A protein has these predicted regions:
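Short, charged beta-turn/beta-strand-edge "cap" motif at the junction between a beta-strand
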Residues: 18-22
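Compact nucleic-acid interaction/catalytic patches
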Residues: 23-28, 33-68
């Protein structure tokens, strides 16, 4: 990457994440810039999130499906739990840029949930519960509860 150019939020570049054990993303893969443009413009580093073509666990708020667009050649998903601070000059070839406001909003919302910045406080006296897909089935088919919203993480 040209050292003079500053990256922007939502841009996708190839980045070599190196070799790791376990579930940490490895190797050369696309990554999206998730750091604010003001910070990108004032420093040599940025924060990126890995992108994978293995689209699973879509119910997690940290997994943002972006499909086969923005320069990507396969249906892909952003992994907001797989972030790294990197030198801007170490980013590889430019792939594309996320220009869809709904996806950008989903990324911001997912980052808040991933880093524990989301307020889950119930409003009023209502009994508010956040359920995994498996537990949700018990509530949907019960006469004791009223399920008002099935997807509280929808952007």
């Amino acid at each position: 990457m040209n050292e003079e150019k500053k990256v922007k939020y939502g841009e996708i570049y190839f980045y070599d994440f190196g070799e790791h054990e376990g579930s940490i993303q490895n190797g050369l893969r696309p990554a999206v810039v998730i750091q604010d443009n003001k910070l990108n413009g004032h420093g040599p580093t940025t924060i990126i999130a890995a992108i994978t073509s293995v689209t699973k666990k879509l119910y997690l708020p940290s997994h943002i499906l972006i499909g086969e667009q923005f320069g990507l050649t396969k249906p892909s998903m952003i992994l907001l739990e797989q972030v790294a601070c990197v030198n801007q000059k170490d980013l590889g070839n430019f792939v594309g840029a996320i220009n869809n406001e709904k996806i950008k909003r989903a990324i911001r919302c997912g980052l808040k949930k991933t880093f524990g910045l989301w307020d889950y406080a119930p409003r009023g006296d209502a009994d508010v519960r956040c359920l995994c897909p498996k537990c949700l089935q018990d509530y949907i088919h019960s006469n004791k509860y009223i399920v008002k919203r099935l997807d509280p993480f929808a952007a």
